[in-house]
Amino acid sequence: VKRPLAILAAVAALATLYLALLRDTTSAGELVTPPPAATIGSGPDAVAVGADGTILAWLPLTEDTALPALPLSSPPEGGRLAGTLLEQVRVLGAAPAALQPYLASSYYGESGVDVELRSGIELRFGDASRLAAKWRAAAAALADPSLSALDYVDLHAPGHPAIGGSGHELPPPP
């Protein structure tokens, strides 16, 4: 009688240990979504897009959501952006938080990705390379106290941005 009880106690102890280890090593699932960087469409049909090109159709947008618009009226099939639209959303997603409220839209022009500010000023990025440096150069140009108006900032060479025109007032500082 003692041997079967000892075996049963050992099995129970091993089962308890196994369950304790299983509980401690089991990881909980976590949904990680990219932050919204732009919108597709307008009004109640607008859909958010993450900085990685993921369509965030489930994310509710309110009238207060101030995301820049991409030049599409509806999301593409497949749930992700590709090509020049993906390049645009990568540029928008890399924008510093202080500049995001000023971003109106993006399009792919002759020089590559262009971002238009709400004031009408155009930021010409070219491709989606060196985004941190290009956004720093854009912020520095927009904060330059010697400027009161301009039309564009060419950021192809972020170390030497080209500034042109005088048709649009600079946005107020954040």
Where are the predicted features?
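Charged, solvent-exposed interaction patches on well-folded alpha/beta domains
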Residues: 2-174
